[in-house]
């Protein structure tokens, strides 16, 4: 099991615009960010800003570098390409969702 900093940061209404291969822009909300000591990276999980609260959504995950204030919406996003890294991100997301459903 990987060692992940369980310090999950829920962001206050941060938005990020993603641009797809065809140049289409879509606005996303930051669900939360977290740091992994094993990978030495920070991660951001996003969902479409246009989705309704009760709607099932596809959550996007990226490694990121933040600005000097730690703002994920002002830094650079990088794809997660390693399978083990993806498994770690999914584990953190599943824990977050399970904890969120308990409240």
UniProtKB/Swiss-Prot annotation:
Say which family it is in. Answer: Belongs to the UPF0473 family.
User: Which organism encodes this protein?
Assistant: Latilactobacillus sakei subsp. sakei (strain 23K) (Lactobacillus sakei subsp. sakei)
Superkingdom: Bacteria
Question: NCBIfam families from the xrefs?
Answer: PRK13678.1-2, PRK13678.1-4
| Name of the protein in its database record | UPF0473 protein LCA_0390
> Pfam families this protein is in?
DUF1292
Record-linked InterPro entries: UPF0473 (IPR009711)
């Amino acid at each position: 099991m990987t060692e992940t900093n369980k310090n999950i940061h829920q962001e206050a209404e941060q938005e990020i615009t993603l641009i797809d291969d065809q140049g289409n822009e879509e606005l996303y909300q930051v669900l939360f960010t977290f740091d992994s000591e094993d990978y030495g990276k920070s991660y951001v999980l996003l969902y479409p800003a246009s989705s309704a609260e009760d709607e099932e959504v596809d959550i996007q995950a990226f490694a990121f570098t933040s600005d000097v204030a730690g703002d994920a919406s002002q830094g650079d996003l990088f794809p997660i390409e390693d399978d083990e890294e993806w498994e770690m991100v999914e584990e953190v997301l599943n824990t977050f969702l399970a904890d969120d459903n308990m409240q």
